[in-house]
């Protein structure tokens, strides 16, 4: 029997079992049940003394036990680490057992199961059926997994089954209550093992009149009275809410491979199961494959206490307890962990994922026709957009113009769409799927058949969006890749933090190297300095800036320094200068490089003036060996990715290389995380210390370098910053570039693992050509050991606001001057939620203007500053005088909560007063809009005081009175504060700001 493993899960009844859900080549699903064991590692002496004898025991052979407590010394008299060798046993017990002096107890039982039996969680195997006992059709028991799974075979493709779903619930203004508000719609995207895809929506007929129900039937909707009448081939089905819920129960109890929702663990699934129990007393029941255990669908929460005030909660995750092998997957939780976005609402995520450039085909009266294909954007972008458009109802044009779809024509690699849209002047626009321009509360207020059918379209689109996002993020291949890499079941891959997922690979390595790491002392946690961030040299750059990144800096630092808890010889600290001087002189004599590396770190305690960590590089440590394995595996899968021919292979190999990248980069963080099995304070701070020296070294050789006559003169000798080696340190290097090239280089910024180097050229093609040669020379001559850099991009018209805040046009290393550059806004207001649309529009306009000025190169920085400030004053005065912009541009939003440090917080007072005077109150957890409003007769106010008193909540009924105006000065001051931080002339900026607002601006820290 040839099978592929697709999920592992446990039952937690009186008799615990581990189950494998697998699939045969013919698509048949097979479950295999194993005994569940608790695992203990003991010495031979303890093993022989156990009474009663262990249930099962396996010899692990001779293993070396190393004490990894940190040795802190005020001199060089450092004691050797405690180390012993003994025969070890792995004990398996069906129930927990108290065994004294057991080691390696921090590892998961499931990881022990895989590793001790030689099983890969996502592997393909030819099973030896003599070790299988049939329980029922499709379910077997296995007591000897090692022999049953002895024959691993090449990977083969299998089909998967999915259920993507979304629900809509009646509500007015408040969040729906399961006790009051019925479910109006449930939409499903159902994909079976044959690949057949069904889309259907159930509409609650109890919210419609009998006349409307009859009209719906006349329009082609199916009306059913019971579960038995359900036809899944029909797109729209009318039924009572109880029938709707029973159909949901039937679907959720099926054994799909995946049930996928967006925030469904916290809302959709919880609402369905609670509403079902409330109306019928029934529960959704899952049964184990052997049919011996039944559990009710239940959502349980995992919380982590927040540091933000008493009782505050951060990072609450929701999980479904089930025992039938289905993976209940919440896209919301997954994307929160894997993507850094401004907002995690479904519309914002889909806007980020599904967008493409569209070409204007026709302009009509209040409508426009767009076409998108491989000629209007990068290959594949239009095809992905078109797929979502099949169910899409609204398209966002140019970031913020929301347009209803009138007609659409979709083909394999493109689309044509007619939108209800104001006439726009440009030939091309960015099209994306953002927020549908609908007010659900108002729709429920005006609810009728047409609205019900409209909502059905929105609901099925959201269900399908789950499928599109599932495919966009490659969740299935990432799940399999994670299971293989982390040695975890597919159902647990995304449930654990990095400190837990690293345990599987670590256990595997420790068993291979016959090593046990133990601590006898309590782990201590001290702060330490992070990566080096340079201050920007200037604000605006008319010349191009080359971006170089270290490849996997921290992993390679750990490998270079052999940083690991057991390779740490000790830490030498000093309390006075004399001690420090003596220690420095003797260190290199006793611990000479390159066998040893001494790392100068910031002192851990205020009474110390120096701290030096010493690492032995003669025998590779656990962390470097682990990292080398991860990086080698990543390189192997990247190579396989390039050679892959099928899309399935490409997806798998890309997910595998990405997973190894993530896990390698997480190791540094785990060294500094006290609850991690890899915790090593000295290693973590030594890692950042070496990283800082490496970025400073690269900056020092590039800052002031010159290219002429085919020769590159680096700014400093190419000396290893840690110890003398036999490399050529001559800073003059021959290049393969034309001899007529003459350019100078200047380092202008850097952050942790990247250096921004200005070249005195505005030619994109030459900049890319030179940067690629620089990359080669730096890797061959400047860097050493395993350190490598990569040329990432050319930044054109770079505007640096401050550290970690910049705007630029990015040309990637693979592009040229004819390529369309990508606009990058890092850490700026365009990416934030707490600024008004007016602010975002204006800052975007002024950054574009600055970029154009830099490109033209006709003005110096003073002239640019004068021109920008003069234009800004004109725009602000004009807006103040005309007062023509709508209130919507000045609205801000805020979440109402009670987790304030002060009980009389103005935000709380604002909502309390609003609720006193309005029947529709703002509840805790509800987001509300507000704006700054003042009396209309108030003249331009320079000095702004007590601005919170001008906050006014904006609801649907709010109208700006004739005696009121927007308090423009609040918005203008915030906007101007950001703009002056883009300009180089502080004197002019201060003068302008004082004249406009009566105070000096706040300049961002360099």
Swiss-Prot record:
Subunit structure: Interacts with OPG148. Component of the Uracil-DNA glycosylase(UDG)-OPG148-polymerase complex; OPG148 and OPG116/UDG form a heterodimeric processivity factor that associates with OPG071 to form the processive polymerase holoenzyme.
Keyword match Nucleotidyltransferase: yes
EC number, as in UniProt: 2.7.7.7, 3.1.11.-
PROSITE patterns found in the cross-reference section: DNA_POLYMERASE_B
Keyword set includes DNA-binding: yes
Keywords in alphabetical order: DNA recombination, DNA replication, DNA-binding, DNA-directed DNA polymerase, Early protein, Exonuclease, Hydrolase, Multifunctional enzyme, Nuclease, Nucleotidyltransferase, Transferase, Viral DNA replication
Name of a matching Pfam family: DNA_pol_B
Domain of life of the organism encoding this protein: Viruses
Family per similarity comment: Belongs to the DNA polymerase type-B family.
Protein name: DNA polymerase
Gene3D superfamilies noted in UniProt: Helix hairpin bin, Palm domain of DNA polymerase, Ribonuclease H-like superfamily/Ribonuclease H
Catalytic activity, as annotated: DNA(n) + a 2'-deoxyribonucleoside 5'-triphosphate = DNA(n+1) + diphosphate
Molecular functions per Gene Ontology: DNA binding; DNA-directed DNA polymerase activity; exonuclease activity; nucleotide binding
GO terms of biological process kind: DNA recombination; DNA replication; viral DNA genome replication
Induction cue: Expressed in the early phase of the viral replicative cycle.
Function summary: Catalyzes DNA synthesis. Acquires processivity by associating with a heterodimeric processivity factor comprised of the viral OPG148 and OPG116 proteins, thereby forming the DNA polymerase holoenzyme. Displays 3'- to 5' exonuclease activity. Might participate in viral DNA recombination. Does not perform OPG116/D4synthesis across an abasic site.
